[in-house]
Amino acid sequence: LIVRPEEIAFDVDGVFADTFRTFVDTARRDFGCDFSYEDITEYDFRTVVEIEEQASEAIIARILEDPIGSGIEPIPGAVDVLTRLAGLAPLLFITARPEETAIRSWILHHLPGVPGSAVRVVATGTGENKRSALLDHGVSCFVEDCLETGFLIDPYRVRPVIFDQPWNRKPHPFHVVRSWRQIAALLEWPRV
């Protein structure tokens, strides 16, 4: 699998942003929860970890409204690969977040070497709506952490690449990457 830079798009949370780790850290620190990152074995984490709904909603609201202030960090290796990639083609992020302003600010904050004009963010509001956004932008490959989205887009000739996380380790037919180095290996880079 080799992907042209202009034909790849990325999810944000769980692929570029280490959002779930921030969720776990905040739940433990601010709400006294006793679960670990590896305990999140379902994308809908509320079905597998013990957390009060009010606490969960408060953390999610904080993460959605202020990803920078929430302390979300990039997944290791992401900044380097995305900065290199932005030199070849505009970056495209497709997120199920309800709005793009806060997460676009987070992306630009963590990609200081990339001009804002080289970053496109599409907030779809739901995972189901990612398919049409991907098709509208001519994407042939999408790096995603949610298996359900993989199954939604695969029949439409958008190849899902699943970024390994504890919640997507069930059997599936998709290509898996475990690091940004592995993502970089999928890309068609210019010959030097």
What do the PLM-derived regions correspond to, one by one?
Residues A86-L91, S117-A118, V158:
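A generic structural motif
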Residues P67-P74, A78-L108, T124:
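Substrate-recognition element of Asp-dependent hydrolases with the DxDx(T/V) motif
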Residues L1-A61:
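Active-site neighborhood of HAD-like aspartate-dependent phosphohydrolases
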Residues I94-V143, L147-F151:
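Substrate-recognition "cap/lid" segment bordering the active-site pocket of phosphatases
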Residues A17-T19, V24-D25, E100-R104, K130-R131, ...:
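Short catalytic/ligand-binding loop motif for oxyanion handling, primarily in non-cytosolic enzymes
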Residues L1, R131-D136, C141, C146-V192:
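Asp-based, Mg2+/Mn2+-dependent phosphohydrolase catalytic module
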